[in-house]
Amino acid sequence: MRLNHKQGTAGEDAALAFLQSQGCTLLARNWHCAYGEIDLIVKNGGMILFVEVKYRKNQRFGGAAYSISPSKLLKLQRSVEYYLQQNRLTNVPCRLDAVLIEGNRPPEWIKNITG
């Protein structure tokens, strides 16, 4: 297993543990479709959260938040729409979030990354 993949998996594990400590329940992990991948899909109360996880060893090159590009955001939005259609989830409150992990700092939960 490549180092980046191991770090990504460890980052997702940490993000999931953090979200579960905040009351979230896992629905899916590494969900794929033609538009891309959603790292974590969780339920928090009555809301479905689609979560992009970004891990960086340090803040060099802008840190974890900097790595969510406009093209990545578009892929995520299309993936979310596809997930909702495929699962026939209409009129279900949902949100696209990010959990950022940098080095040994606690995870940072950014809610509603689409604005």
From Swiss-Prot:
This is UPF0102 protein NGO_1987. Belongs to the UPF0102 family. It comes from Neisseria gonorrhoeae (strain ATCC 700825 / FA 1090). Gene3D superfamilies: 3.40.1350.10. InterPro entries: Restrct_endonuc-II-like, tRNA_endonuc-like_dom_sf, UPF0102_YraN-like. Pfam families: UPF0102. GO terms for molecular function: nucleic acid binding.
